[in-house]
Each structure stands twice: as C-alpha cells, then as structure tokens.
Amino acid sequence: MANSKSAKKRALQSEKRRQHNASRRSMLRTYVKKVIAAIKAGDHKTAAEAFAVAQPIVDRMATKGLIHKNKAARQKARLNAKIKAIAA
C-alpha cells in the first residue's frame, strides 16, 4: 500500500486511468465484433457500414495510445480484406 501522499495520489490516478482505458478497450472490441459478425453473416453492405464506423475509432484509440499503431493498421487491413472477399 502507498505510504507517501504522492504515492497515494499516483495509485488513485493509476486506478482511474485503468478504468477509463478498460472502458475504451471494451468499446473498441464491441465495434470490431460488429464488423466480424456482419462478415460471418456474409452481409457485405452491413459489414462495410460497420467497418466505416469502426475504422475512425480504431485510429483514435491508436492515437491515444490505447493500442499500438501497427496493431490498428493490421486490424483495419484484415477486416477490409475480409469485406472485399465477401464482395468477390
């Protein structure tokens, strides 16, 4: 347990950030899951619409440091490739 005043403050800040990041990470996963569900259903239009909504959120989370920028790029590329495969 934190002994000094500054250590207590850091512990409180850390917990606050952890909860905030967990909420954001959950939101990100939800949007990505919507795209994946539409892809599995084989619905190109719905998948494309869900991807259009999820894409800026993935980018924003990478900018904020919640996920790595390479992970964001990889996630978007893979989802987009799967959506294009449905159309073909």
Curated annotation (Swiss-Prot):
GO terms for molecular function: small ribosomal subunit rRNA binding; structural constituent of ribosome. It comes from the Bacteria. GO terms for cellular component: cytosol; small ribosomal subunit. Residues 1-27 are annotated as: Disordered. Transmembrane segments: none annotated. The keyword Membrane does not apply. One of its GO terms (biological process) is translation. Keywords: Ribonucleoprotein, Ribosomal protein, RNA-binding, rRNA-binding. The keyword Ribonucleoprotein applies. Belongs to the bacterial ribosomal protein bS20 family. Binds directly to 16S ribosomal RNA. This is Small ribosomal subunit protein bS20.
